[in-house]
Amino acid sequence: MRLTKYLLPFTLILMFSLLTGCTSNEKGETASKKQTDEKMITIGWPLDVGPLNPHTYLPNQMTAQAMVYESLVDYNDDGTITPKLAESWDISKDKTSYVFHLRKDVKYSDGTAFNADNVIRNFDAVLANRELHSWMGMVNHIKEVVKVDDYTIRLQLDEPYYPVLNELAFVRPFRFLGDNGFPEGDATQDAMKAPIGTGPWVLTDYKKDEYALFSRNDNYWGEKPLVEQIKVKIIPDSESISLAFENEELDLIYGRGIISLDNYTYLKDSGKYKTATSEPLSTKALLFNTQSGPLAELKVRQAIQYAINKEQMVDSITHGTEKVADTLFWDAIPYANIDLAPILYNPKKAQQLLEEAGWKLQKGEKIRSKNGQPLTLDLIYIATDAIQKPMAELMQGELAKIGVQLNLEGADVMVGLQKLMDNQVDINFWRTNGPPTDPHSFANESATPNANGVYEAKLGLPTAKEIDTKIHQLLVGTDEKERVQLYTDILTMFHDQALFFPISYETNSVIYQPYMKDFAPRASEYDIPYAQMEKEK
């Protein structure tokens, strides 16, 4: 990889060294490299950052979108909502009208204005594709977004929807593209001209599937980042990311599943590097497809959960960086601190349940059968996730002990999701969204077709329609006590029907070079705290 912007400074230094009689070009090169590296943080990432379209999803990487684009409000790790591009807001008594007062000191990275007209243009572009964004419940309730004055807008709902501010804080789709980034006709769902945002970083160099270089936004209205550039090196293989880090080609490795936990533990235990772990941010689980096949039976779903030694699996594979999950959400998630009895490891109970369900182990056979059909299940895991594959392989072995054949397939996340929604696979690895949208985004998606697979997976449950009704009631209701009870009912029904197999509460783990200053990883799926990163002088 050759970058002209780095060759020019080097050439000038070399010429100066020759003119002043310097006898060691090697020393000059070393000094130049050190100066450049001090101003840049390099991180490894398994996937290309994508086109950086703020209004669309994959292949856009959320971590990169969050560097360039900002929201009206911000969600903090303690669960509070604070101002961002909106300096304040007013909510009507009936909870259907939100008036946002925009900051007047904000410019886009190209120097153009951020104002009410631009905000409405972005809202209109997103709302032109309501179906695409239907997983976000607010989209289905926005009646109109109108300009009050140059720096004030009003968002009008058709009925109350309590998570409005949380959803506005999410990384997509309600973040803001500069006017010069819009395509002709404003159809941003198809393409955009350029990734122009108000955030602290601007994309300045990019080579697909190799790297993306972000430079500090000189027009940024907030506190400037401590370093000048962030380089994201695209390295699909987790082993190669670890090796690049050991060779000091990377300054840090950040996030869940980027490298194997074995490699993380090896690097941590070497004593050469710094490490940190965030608070829990999401839950890793299996999602069972109840539409047809063996998993349409409750006892089969329960048997699978009893058959897997979850505690041993989580400890051995995550090396303590994740906590065993017995419920779908950890207790600190709003409305999720519910007393639910966990399903504990009990292979004898698992076999008993399968016998009761009519799945018998015939003499000389290793796989149970019923009415001539073998008890065979298909599981899809994300091929690029360094943790899901070893977990899938361990579960494959555990289920074989009770007479269940588990077939494994590694695939792209969207391939697995589509197969589940099309009723072509039995089990998917699945995870909650985490802050700032849990648990309400989970609830909304669970009642929305073609969202995250839960709606389709639960179609075989006897309580499916009742769950959908309760979800609608809690999202539009204004009574807090009623909302608490509805969440309790919904989460209890999912738990009792064994639709999910909670595995672990995930965290962001970070390992960084000793010359990096300490920083705290955030309990966020997408917000990497680049602005706080700095190298020792």
Which ranges hold each PLM region?
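Gly/Pro-rich hinge or "lid" segments in bacterial periplasmic/extracellular proteins
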Residues: 77, 170-225, 229, 239, ...
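Extracellular/periplasmic solute-recognition and catalytic clefts
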Residues: 146, 204-215, 231-292, 302-303, ...
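Long beta-strand-rich cores associated with HINT superfamily self-processing modules
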Residues: 510-537
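Surface-exposed binding/hinge segments that line
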Residues: 137-181
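Extracytoplasmic/peripheral linker and loop segments enriched in polar/acidic and small residues
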Residues: 405-416, 444-513, 537
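Aromatic- and charge-enriched surface segment that lines or borders ligand/interaction sites
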Residues: 87-132, 154, 294-296
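Append "and occasionally in soluble cytosolic enzymes with long acidic Gly/Pro-rich linkers
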Residues: 296-397, 535-536
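N-terminal lobe/hinge region of extracytoplasmic solute-binding protein
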Residues: 44-93, 124, 196, 524-526
